[in-house]
């Protein structure tokens, strides 16, 4: 997904809705079979959480570069998480990846 500005990102992301746990499991099964559409659907359902994370950051971090870092963190979290196990919640895994992204972005910018 391509964004022209941070406002464009917020606007496009606001149209996505969160999935239920059952829908996540169905997408996970489809992902296991190799479906990239299911992966994209999972990623899109968590973009509003990423947008909320970005909004809570200082002004110097609210730019498209940081959006890209956060999108990569979301993709990494989706790829590494086993939705079929109930060991931890995906939100916990995603928030961990986003905090790592904050640190990485700050280190690379200064």
Predicted ranges, named:
Residues 1-110:
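Alpha-helical promoter-recognition and RNA polymerase-docking modules of transcription initiation factors
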């Amino acid at each position: 997904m391509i964004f022209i500005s941070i406002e464009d990102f917020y606007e496009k992301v606001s149209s996505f809705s969160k999935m239920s746990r059952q829908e996540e499991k169905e997408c996970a099964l489809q992902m296991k079979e190799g479906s990239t559409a299911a992966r994209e659907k999972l990623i899109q359902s968590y973009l509003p959480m990423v947008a909320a994370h970005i909004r809570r950051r200082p002004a110097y971090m609210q730019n498209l570069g940081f959006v890209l870092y956060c999108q990569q963190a979301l993709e990494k979290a989706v790829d590494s998480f086993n939705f079929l196990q109930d060991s931890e919640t995906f939100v916990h895994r995603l928030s961990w990846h986003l905090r790592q992204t904050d640190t990485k972005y700050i280190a690379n910018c200064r």
